[in-house]
Regions:
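Catalytic NTP-binding/metal-coordinating core of nucleotidyl cyclase/transferase enzymes
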Residues: 1-73, 79-80
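Catalytic beta-strand-to-alpha-helix segment of the class III nucleotidyl cyclase homology domain
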Residues: 39, 61-147
Length: 149
């Protein structure tokens, strides 16, 4: 059996709020909005050296080398989505939740696994709409950088 590849990473989990409800009532407009949001989110993740590992419809799992980079990406993309929603008048105004956690992960092919991924997803599900919820370990790591975020 081959050795499992592990490394420390910051995991960002995000999900679109009430996506199923939107898609049920306005399928094509919701898909258009989702595509517009992804055109905002994906480049921001890349800008802060993140890599998208998994997407499932309206959710994204990305990993970053740095908790500061992950947090900056989350802050910037939430602000950009809010700005988009201020000017959007045809399609649904989609909102997102974000959870960020730092932990050891398992890398297998093009995917990541581990308890850290699950914790980031749980934080995302508990995050207020349009906000970011970070774990205590992330808070400890970015504490001195908070002034600049």
């Amino acid at each position: 059996m081959s050795e499992v590849k592990r490394r420390l990473a910051t995991i960002l989990a995000t999900d679109c709020v009430d996506f199923s409800k939107h898609i049920e009532s306005q399928e094509e407009k919701t898909l258009s909005s989702l595509k517009e949001c992804r055109e905002i989110i994906d480049p921001i993740i890349n800008k802060f050296s993140g890599r998208i590992f998994h997407t499932a419809g309206d959710s994204i799992i990305a990993e970053f080398d740095s908790p500061v980079g992950a947090t900056k990406a989350g802050v910037e993309f939430q602000k950009s989505i809010k700005d988009r929603n201020l000017t959007e008048d045809k399609n649904p105004k989609l909102s997102w939740r974000v959870g960020i956690h730092l932990d050891d992960i398992i890398i297998e092919g093009d995917n990541i696994y581990g308890n850290g991924v699950n914790i980031a997803a749980r934080l995302e599900s508990q995050s207020p709409v349009g906000e970011i919820l970070i774990s205590d370990v992330v808070r400890q790591q970015i504490y001195l950088s908070l002034i600049h975020i």
